């Protein structure tokens, strides 16, 4: 190891920065996977994770096993039994520019045929069927062990208790639990009327709902499910094995078994197809049945998937392109407060109506009084507005140059 002043100083700075942001990333991951209120925005979280990985790439000494940049999810929460997955669940490699997506497609993927899918903004789960019967439903957890939420999974009408047709002896079906966008406002209104916690976005609502201690309470939540992958598969017939040769064939099997799959998926076989899919669903994202935060591409050949394998965190045969949030400017007309049944005061902005992420908004949350002070917004300001998770309008801050 080189011990000159510059390298030592750089490593010291890197370690100091790592120590500053790693705990924040860990806390954000725990909140994300537990359904608690987010402590940072998705975009801020993505930036922190990218910075953490960059620090660890430049200084491998920082890439310890406990680093949140090396993790897949979060440990199982207290209050639920742990359950081991038969095969590990991985995260996905994220890219944030079309150039990086093209590099993956033409490089790693070798411009192979891929499935193109939207990235559902939900809670990842693993469903284990034994003899065609739902035996275990678990959250992703850390990828090796998750939370046993079988009783709550059984309350989701779109999750079949029994598979149909020609199914394997054992199969793990991976997918996302979500609350449909059309159901979210009504769900939050019922929460508000009952004096219960409202959720910032559908994903948090889904995560919180799936972790209800009482399955009857979970059954009252408008949860839905879509499958997007498989883990362990044992005892499949030759006909099933033939279809398992491709990702497309896997999805066809899911449909034959009575398992819901995404209506927003298709095969792509050129860069133009890939880019076209990204742009198409960037325009349609507010019109889908569920929230999305990106587009996912998977090499269609499962033999090629096997050959490429995975890192300790992500498969090399798949990638997720993350969409940036839509941000618009409008005039802040007033700041008002809403007092909840528990006495909690929530300030909100009254604005000149503006269209953002597919709908017209005239009010936006300011979260709490300290956030108003931190953002420094004043009545009469031109402010930047976006929808958190593409659902909840929020004011990011003023356009100070226009004051």
Regions found by a protein language model. Give the residues of each.
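RNA/tRNA-interacting regions in translation and RNA-turnover enzymes
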Residues: 2-403
């Amino acid at each position: 190891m080189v011990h000159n002043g510059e390298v030592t100083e750089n490593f010291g700075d890197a370690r100091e920065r790592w120590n500053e942001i790693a705990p924040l990333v860990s806390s954000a991951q725990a909140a994300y996977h537990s359904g608690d209120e987010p402590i940072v925005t998705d975009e801020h979280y993505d930036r922190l994770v990218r910075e953490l990985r960059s620090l660890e790439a430049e200084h491998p000494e920082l890439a310890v096993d406990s680093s949140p940049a090396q993790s897949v999810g979060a440990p199982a929460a207290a209050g639920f039994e742990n359950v081991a997955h038969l095969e590990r669940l991985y995260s996905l490699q994220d890219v944030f520019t079309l150039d990086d997506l093209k590099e993956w497609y033409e490089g790693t993927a070798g411009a192979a045929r891929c499935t193109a899918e939207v990235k559902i903004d939900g809670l990842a789960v693993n469903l284990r069927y034994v003899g065609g019967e739902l035996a275990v439903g678990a959250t992703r957890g850390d990828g090796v062990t998750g939370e046993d939420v079988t009783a709550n999974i059984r309350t989701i009408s779109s999750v079949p208790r029994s598979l149909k047709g020609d199914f394997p002896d054992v199969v793990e079906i991976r997918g996302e639990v979500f609350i449909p966008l059309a159901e979210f406002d009504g769900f939050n209104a019922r929460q508000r009327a009952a004096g219960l916690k409202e959720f910032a976005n559908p994903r948090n609502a889904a995560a919180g709902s799936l972790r209800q201690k009482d399955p009857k309470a979970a059954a009252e939540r408008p949860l839905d499910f879509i499958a997007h992958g498989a883990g362990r598969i044992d005892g499949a017939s030759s006909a099933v094995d033939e279809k398992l040769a491709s990702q497309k064939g896997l999805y066809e099997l899911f449909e034959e078994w009575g398992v819901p799959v995404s209506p927003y998926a298709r095969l792509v076989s050129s860069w133009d197809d890939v880019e076209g899919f990204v742009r198409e669903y960037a325009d349609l994202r507010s019109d889908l049945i569920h929230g999305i935060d990106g587009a996912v591409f998977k090499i269609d050949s499962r033999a090629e998937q096997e050959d490429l394998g995975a890192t300790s965190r992500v498969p090399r045969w798949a990638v997720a392109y993350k969409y940036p949030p839509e941000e618009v400017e409008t005039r802040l007309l007033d700041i008002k407060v809403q007092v909840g049944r528990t006495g909690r005061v929530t300030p909100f902005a009254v604005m000149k109506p503006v269209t953002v992420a597919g709908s017209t908004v005239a009010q936006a949350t300011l979260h709490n009084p300290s956030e108003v002070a931190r953002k420094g917004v004043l009545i009469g300001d031109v402010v930047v507005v976006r929808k958190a998770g593409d659902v909840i309008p929020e004011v990011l801050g003023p356009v100070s140059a226009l004051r």
